[in-house]
Structures are given as structure tokens and as C-alpha cells.
Amino acid sequence: KRYYESRKLPMTLEDAIEITNDDGTLKEVKYEFVELRLGNHCNVMCRTCNPYSSSRWVKEWDVIYPEEPVIKEHISQKNINWPLEQDFWDKLIKYCDKLKVLYINGGEPFLIDKHFSFLQTLVERGISKDIEIVYSTNCTIINHTYEDIWKEFKSVQFMLSIDDIGERNEYIRTYTKWPKVLDF
């Protein structure tokens, strides 16, 4: 991901100085790259994951690590429901006129339909053709009804989280079915 970011959005020291005031503040807040980590709502329980990125881990993590209240507080539903709040999306859109890359992950981003309303707003504002969308997904869910929205963007890429093939992938990524991953 870092390679992708530095290749797509290179910024030199001169670029940084040009957009910065003498006191270190930005002259204007306009996002070129936005990463939307849409909470931890996920349909998979990967052995390499944790409750920060997968809601499927919350109950077991509670049993395994009962002494970690900081984790419990961090992953509580009240801290991860922000993707469902319209106020967040209304504030974000104000800074997206110069947006070039929108990186969307989760949990599993395709479980959070609210972000498609945001994409539609970018289309309605006439800025979608300059924006690349990049999804990080576990390849178990795709909603093809949104393809019409995606066509309005410069490009849509999918970074696929696959740890192995067949039964080994199903073992590592509990609740996945390999044939469904192949259908993605």
C-alpha cells in the first residue's frame, strides 16, 4: 500500500513547503488521498487478524484477553459506527474537490453500503472522473448493482486479501468458501 501511495501521489519537499504557511499550518485543506477504514464490521474471522479489523473476533478475543479493557473500549460498537453517521460524510465531502485516490477498507468495505452514497455525491459534484477508487476486500462479497457508479470514476481497483488457495485459505480465513472467492 505504501508503495502504491508514494507512486501515485509523490510529494517533494518543495511541494510541501508550497502548501504550508510559515507557522506549519496548511494554507488550504484539500485532500488528494483519503483512506476510509470503515470500522471493523467483517464477515470473516482470519487467524491473522484481530478485533480492530474484524468484528467476528470480538467475542473470542474477550475470552482470550479478558484483562485488556483498552481493546474492549476501542472495539466497542460506539467507537466504530461512525461510517453510518451522515454528519461524517457531510464533513468529509467539503474537502474532496482535489481528491485523486480514495482507498476504502474495513473490516469488509462491502458490508458498509453507506459509502456508496458518498461515491454518488462525488459523481453529482462532477469530480469523480479524476478519482481512483482502491478497495481492500476479502473477496467474499461484491454488489454488482454499484457498477454504474464505479463507471463514473477514473478507475476502480481491488486489492484482494487472499492468504492461500482452497481449503488452506478457508482454514486461515474462517467463514470463507474458496469457490465464492473465485467468483469475486
Regions found by a protein language model. Name each.
Residues 1, 42, 46-49:
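Short cysteine clusters
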Residues 29-41, 52-84, 97-115, 125-144, ...:
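Core AdoMet radical
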Residues 89, 119, 146-147, 182:
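Generic structural signal for well-ordered alpha-helices
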